[in-house]
Every structure is written in structure tokens, then in C-alpha cells.
Amino acid sequence: MGLEKSFILFSLLVLVLGWVQPSLGVESRESSADKFKRQHMDPESPSKSSPTYCNQMMKRQGMTKGSCKPVNTFVHEPLEDVQAICSQGQVTCKNGRNNCHKSSSTLHITECRLKGSSKYPNCEYTTTDSQKHIIIACEGNPLVPVHYDDTV
């Protein structure tokens, strides 16, 4: 009888885990490289962003769920060009690690900054377009971007 109860409880546990696991969200299975692409790559946008670009993109790319991400940068260049930065000048990252690389040329970027008066869930951002060098952290073999470190 005890073995039968254990089997039933185990079966119920497996069933519950089967329901819970698919609802854990994309972020829990997202690789660092995929997260970098989601948070920072937007090669399709025109050279000049609209004033509401950041409000739309930050929400669309999942950076206003649970809280407002204070700062984010989108790169408007082909992914291959950004991946190529991983073989360019190596520099020290803000956190002291040595896996960062600085772009040899300027890239079209949009910087999104949370407005001072903005509070979750109504995240509002300022949108600033510019041409600047970027610094990204790269990992793996082959090296791929996994973190946006700075704009210079």
C-alpha cells in the first residue's frame, strides 16, 4: 500500500512539473549570445529613430517586465559586423575582465535612458541616436558577443 501511494505521489509530481516547466519563460533558457541579440541588436531600423523608438523597443524586447531597465543601447548594424568586433582590439571590461573588444570604427546606435520621473510599469525613455565606438564582451569558440559593456 505504501509503495502504491509513493507511485501516485510521484506521478502527480511529474504531472505538475510538466505543467510548470513550459511556463518558465524564454529568459530561463536564453543563451548569453541570444540575450545580447535580443537586448542590443536592431539592424533593420532606419538611420534615425523616432522619439518613441526606445519606449516601443524596450517593451517589445522584454526589458520592462517586472522593472524598467535604466539604460540600454541598440546597435543598427548587421549582426556579422558586430560579431566581427570580437576579433578587434581587446580592452579591459568595466568589471575588470579581459574579454572585451572595442569596435575599430563607429557604429550607428540608439541609446535609451529611463526618464527621471518614469516609474514601473509606465517605463518612459529618452531616445538618442549617435555614431560611436562600442565595447562588447565576447565568449565562446568562435567568439560571439555576450554583453554590451560601453559606448565611447
Curated annotation (Swiss-Prot):
Region feature (Disordered): 31-53
Catalysis: reaction(s): an [RNA] containing cytidine + H2O = an [RNA]-3'-cytidine-3'-phosphate + a 5'-hydroxy-ribonucleotide-3'-[RNA]; an [RNA] containing uridine + H2O = an [RNA]-3'-uridine-3'-phosphate + a 5'-hydroxy-ribonucleotide-3'-[RNA]
Signal peptide, first to last residue: 1-25
Annotated active site: 40, 147
Matches recorded under InterPro entries: RNaseA, RNaseA-like_dom_sf, RNaseA_AS, RNaseA_domain
Disulphide-bridged cysteine pairs: 54-112, 68-123, 86-138, 93-100
Keyword Hydrolase in record: yes
One CC-aspect GO term: extracellular region
Top EC class of this enzyme: lyase
One annotated GO biological process: defense response to Gram-positive bacterium
UniProt-annotated location(s): Secreted
Superkingdom, taxonomy of origin: Eukaryota
Biased composition (Basic and acidic residues): 31-45
Alphabetic keyword roster: Disulfide bond, Endonuclease, Hydrolase, Lyase, Nuclease, Secreted, Signal
Transmembrane domains' residue ranges: none
Molecular function terms from GO: lyase activity; nucleic acid binding; ribonuclease A activity
EC numbers for this chain: 4.6.1.18
Positions annotated to bind substrate: 35, 38, 69-73, 94, 113
Described function: Endonuclease that catalyzes the cleavage of RNA on the 3' side of pyrimidine nucleotides. Acts on single-stranded and double-stranded RNA.
Subunit structure: Monomer.
Similarity remark: Belongs to the pancreatic ribonuclease family.
The protein's name: Ribonuclease pancreatic beta-type
Protein source organism: Rattus exulans
